[in-house]
């Protein structure tokens, strides 16, 4: 068999890679040879080739994200809707106990830093777009393709910008004084369509608008910090607020339990969840290892300071009952009480809507890149079409899928106010499951490469803390009253997350194990060059006596 030649697009011919594996036919339609990554293959040799070629392969979009753009991506993803909506459910699940409330926020920040350095170390080993998808499939290579297919399917099915969209719709209506909450869904859907078109038509213009909204968000962060300082030193409440209660007091008839603390942590950790987002677009970052080493910790520090100031403001201005009853609109209630209905209720609500809009743009941008990497692997139907940078040299198909799934969830969700909390918990539970696997995978990777030193190294204690905490977070919801973890006709959030993961497992089992075994064929990867230089994989059937 003739070896296959992959040209790296470099002037040095020594960087050409010859692949001596059976992969099927290669298309002869070549475009730019600054190619993206290609999939996991059928042999150990192909995996080695993949690791070798990943060093110099580039995406067609090029490296255009510097430190500022990366900080904007981090901050915009982290600070979306969470701090304006989640404090209500956290205070409720901690029983109004301020000591536990602030301890959860501090602990969440510490785990976020540990998780950030976990990803920074993995990212220094594997500096390419895909994030945890790449980390998992390089760590868990057996059973063949299991982790790749399961995580890929799960990521596509849960690839939505939902929580930010819900908050955006609610706060836009609040800013314009609309009391009919049924319109919030249509506002959310309209902006999702706008975001899909912006990123799907032009990468450059999409990033420009994203950076502009991110800049406004940074200004908002400064204003929020000043609001926290103002309430701490100058604001005088007219009655007893949550801040005035004893620090260890638990409210009567509270829901405080092991399970409720786990739910509170999931909600709090959700507010920091964007620390792993930028690794999904590593191939578009200039000098990714050094850039992420600076922008990652800086972004988390900025967000933690802002969160602390905002939490002080909530407790200094509002009562326990006001915070809990406000739900996702707790941010609007705070600023209305601070600055009056005209400034606080309108202007601040509009500002929060801008923050949520920035978050939506970043989430859709990041998810579309993950989806594109997944479709390039060829596991799912229509992968060739969904992975294309078409028709405007931007991944419109994968962006559109993210928008479609988000809109579908918005339409399906019940109207109850608990829908937001349910989504946060469901999304957080699934992410916690895969974060556990990534943390375990780092130790596997270190063992395989024990003679090599990464450019960035995560704390072993921090990684062990993530593993321990993740196990606790995954088990705790099963010890609670199931009715507390569900909404409408949907099952408890942890069951919903696990059902999606199990469905992804059965997809792998049927397509890559059972059907080939029963019908006597094996699946081999056929590598295809797209017109823009992307390398994608198709899985073709080859008869065998297996």
Curated annotation (Swiss-Prot):
The chain crosses the membrane at residues 71-91, 99-119, 149-169, 189-209, 214-234, 255-275, 298-318, 320-340, 347-367, 394-414, 424-444, 460-480, 495-515. GO terms for molecular function: L-amino acid transmembrane transporter activity; L-methionine transmembrane transporter activity. GO terms for biological process: amino acid transmembrane transport; methionine import across plasma membrane. Gene3D superfamilies: Amino acid/polyamine transporter I. GO terms for cellular component: fungal-type vacuole; membrane. It is found in: Membrane. To yeast high affinity methionine permease (MUP1). Very low affinity permease for methionine. This is Low-affinity methionine permease. It comes from Saccharomyces cerevisiae (strain ATCC 204508 / S288c).
């Amino acid at each position: 068999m003739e070896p296959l030649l992959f040209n790296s697009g470099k002037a040095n011919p020594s960087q050409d890679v010859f692949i001596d594996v059976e992969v099927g036919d290669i298309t002869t339609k070549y475009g730019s040879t600054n190619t993206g990554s290609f999939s996991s293959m059928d042999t150990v040799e192909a995996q080695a080739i993949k690791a070798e070629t990943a060093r110099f392969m580039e995406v067609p979009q090029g490296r255009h994200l510097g430190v500022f753009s990366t900080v904007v991506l981090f901050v915009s993803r982290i600070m979306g809707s969470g701090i304006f909506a989640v404090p209500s459910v956290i205070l409720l699940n901690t029983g109004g106990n301020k000591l536990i409330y602030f301890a959860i926020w501090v602990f969440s920040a510490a785990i976020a830093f540990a998780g950030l350095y976990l990803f920074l170390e993995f990212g220094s080993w594997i500096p390419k777009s895909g994030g945890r998808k790449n980390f998992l499939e390089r760590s868990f290579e057996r059973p063949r393709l299991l982790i790749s297919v399961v995580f890929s399917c799960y990521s596509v099915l849960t690839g939505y910008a939902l929580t930010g969209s819900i908050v955006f719709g609610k706060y836009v209506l609040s800013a314009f004084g609309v009391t009919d909450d049924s319109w919030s869904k249509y506002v959310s859907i309209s902006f999702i369509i706008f975001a899909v078109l912006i990123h799907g038509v032009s990468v450059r213009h999409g990033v420009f608008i994203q950076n502009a909204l991110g800049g406004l968000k940074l200004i908002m962060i400064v204003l929020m910090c000043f609001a926290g300082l103002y309430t701490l030193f100058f604001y005088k409440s007219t009655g007893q607020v949550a801040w005035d209660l004893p620090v260890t007091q638990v409210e009567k008839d509270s829901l405080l339990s092991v399970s409720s603390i786990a739910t509170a942590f999931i909600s709090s950790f959700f507010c920091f969840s964007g620390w792993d987002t930028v690794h999904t677009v590593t191939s578009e970052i200039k000098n990714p290892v050094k850039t992420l080493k600076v922008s990652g910790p800086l972004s988390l520090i900025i967000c933690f300071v802002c969160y602390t100031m905002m939490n002080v403001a909530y407790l200094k201005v509002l009562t326990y009952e006001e915070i809990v009853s406000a739900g996702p609109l707790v941010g609007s209630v705070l600023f209305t009480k601070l600055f009056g209905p005209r400034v606080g209720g309108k202007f601040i609500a509009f500002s929060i809507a801008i923050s949520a809009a920035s978050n939506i743009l970043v989430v859709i941008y990041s998810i579309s890149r993950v989806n594109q990497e997944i479709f390039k692997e060829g596991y799912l139907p229509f992968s060739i079409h969904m992975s294309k940078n078409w028709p405007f040299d931007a991944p419109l198909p994968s962006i559109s899928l993210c928008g479609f799934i988000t809109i579908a969830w918005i339409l399906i969700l019940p109207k109850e106010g608990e829908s937001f909390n349910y989504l946060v918990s469901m999304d957080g539970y699934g992410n916690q499951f895969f974060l556990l696997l990534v943390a375990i995978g780092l130790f596997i990777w270190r063992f395989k490469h024990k003679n090599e030193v990464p450019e960035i190294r995560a704390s072993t204690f921090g990684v062990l803390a993530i593993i321990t905490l993740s196990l606790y977070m995954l088990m705790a919801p099963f010890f609670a009253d199931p009715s507390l973890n569900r909404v409408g006709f949907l099952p408890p959030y942890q069951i919903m997350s696990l059902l999606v993961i199990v469905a992804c497992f059965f997809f792998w089992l049927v397509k890559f194990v059972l059907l080939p075994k029963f019908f006597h064929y094996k699946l081999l990867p056929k590598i295809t060059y797209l017109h823009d230089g992307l390398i994608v994989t198709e899985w073709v059937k080859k008869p065998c006596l297996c």
